[in-house]
Amino acid sequence: MSNRMWGGRFASGPAEIMEEINASIGFDKRLAPQDIRGSLAHVAMLGKAGILPAEDVAAIEAGLKSVRDEIEAGTFAFKRELEDIHMSVESRLTEIVGPAAGRLHTARSRNDQVATDMKLWVRDTLDSLDQQAADLQRALADKALKHADTVMPGFTHLQSAQPVTFGHHCLAYVEMLARDRGRFRDARARLNESPLGAAALAGTSFPIDRHATAAALGFDRPTANSLDSVADRDFALEALAAASICAVHLSRFAEELVVWTSAQFNFVRLSDGFTTGSSIMPQKRNPDAAELVRAKSGRIIGALTGLLIVMKGLPLAYSKDMQEDKEGTFDALQALSLCLAAMTGMVKDLEPNAEVLARAAGSGYATATDLADWLVRELGLPFRQAHHVTGRLVGVASAKGVGLEALSLPEMQEAEPRITEAVYAVLGVENSVASRTSYGGTAPDNVRRQAQAWIERLG
């Protein structure tokens, strides 16, 4: 007979390669705090329900706390032959308290146990990510307030489009992160039902109190269907989906920082703390932190795709395939945590090059829309006609190699005879930015109000 905890049915133990492919302790030991929390709630409920005698409950509780202390102290020996964190904890518990440890698994399966552990871990991690995203929002809002008047080019198709302010650009990411945090909280709310007590898949014949264990572990309620309880990994998928969208936002910002810090743009300067040098080129200051944020977004998205593919073909309820939920989820959410921390540090330290930004804001005929708007407002032209007139003037200026503001009034009047000297007032980038006073626009006063509102909201 096999000496495994599940080995009564087997005449011999598993092959060595079976042990290797089956073991998850190398990565699921991360679930130790959650596993012990779940076991403490479970054994307390078993005692209150009269399923276990008080002396066994007390011994098991004391033993679990001893195991927890060993793990926290780094003295706990994790063994591959014990497969996973559940068997590892129970094996050590047996060594500490003896046969009473075997009663802990009454009315419980590893199926509902691991689902509970994973939900607790994902919930804890979502809470942490929410706080990290808020930290990045604060850094961005502070930077936005400081640079509400710093004019820069706004881009479409990575071509100069209209002037905006650096503060306005920062606030765009504050808004994205607000949606990310909303998704973290939505995912948390949906996962907050306890699968503990669903057992293998059909529930249990013991008179357990699932509402009690749910409350003890901070869940809103127990799950309503035992099959779904152990088959569900939606909570991990939702967390990974939310993480992936957040990672996309961080990657877009990271890409901008990589471009903006190049000598060709020179829009911003990152501190030495977030750049590295070259082993051969002494002049280099490489934006490695931003590049790694950009790269790790691919890893995070890959974890979501991987788990979707694992889950798509599984019949109810539990299959060993679901063991593959952990490494990708752990890695992706840890990677996002690292990216949020790195991006927060970069934002706090970076400084925009205001002179370069202002010059760039005036290039590429970025005030052409302001000219078209002036033609509509002051001369009453339909916008499409104003667009056409402005396009002609851009063509003239481009042929001469000058900006719109350098065209003479007679040259302007060749395209539209009613144009007056007053038109030149709208061709400066500062005036252009100041005129964008619509709600959500880039006018500096708007930016200051929005930045201050976010700073107050974030605390």
UniProtKB/Swiss-Prot annotation:
Pathway assignment: Amino-acid biosynthesis; L-arginine biosynthesis; L-arginine from L-ornithine and carbamoyl phosphate: step 3/3
Span of the signal peptide: none
Chief place where the protein resides: cytoplasm
Gene Ontology CC: one annotated term: cytosol
Subcellular location: Cytoplasm
InterPro entries: Arg_succ_lyase_C (IPR029419), Argininosuccinate_lyase (IPR009049), Fumarase/histidase_N (IPR024083), Fumarate_lyase_CS (IPR020557), Fumarate_lyase_fam (IPR000362), Fumarate_lyase_N (IPR022761), L-Aspartase-like (IPR008948)
Keywords tagged on the record: Amino-acid biosynthesis, Arginine biosynthesis, Cytoplasm, Lyase
EC annotation from Swiss-Prot or TrEMBL: 4.3.2.1
GO biological process: arginine biosynthetic process via ornithine; L-arginine biosynthetic process
EC primary class: lyase
A Pfam family annotated for this UniProt entry: ASL_C2
Catalytic activity: 2-(N(omega)-L-arginino)succinate = fumarate + L-arginine
Molecular function terms from GO: argininosuccinate lyase activity
Family under the similarity heading: Belongs to the lyase 1 family. Argininosuccinate lyase subfamily.
HAMAP family linked to this entry: Arg_succ_lyase
PANTHER family xref list: ARGININOSUCCINATE LYASE (PTHR43814:SF1)
Protein known as: Argininosuccinate lyase
Species classification: Bacteria, Pseudomonadati, Pseudomonadota, Alphaproteobacteria, Hyphomicrobiales
Gene that specifies this protein: argH
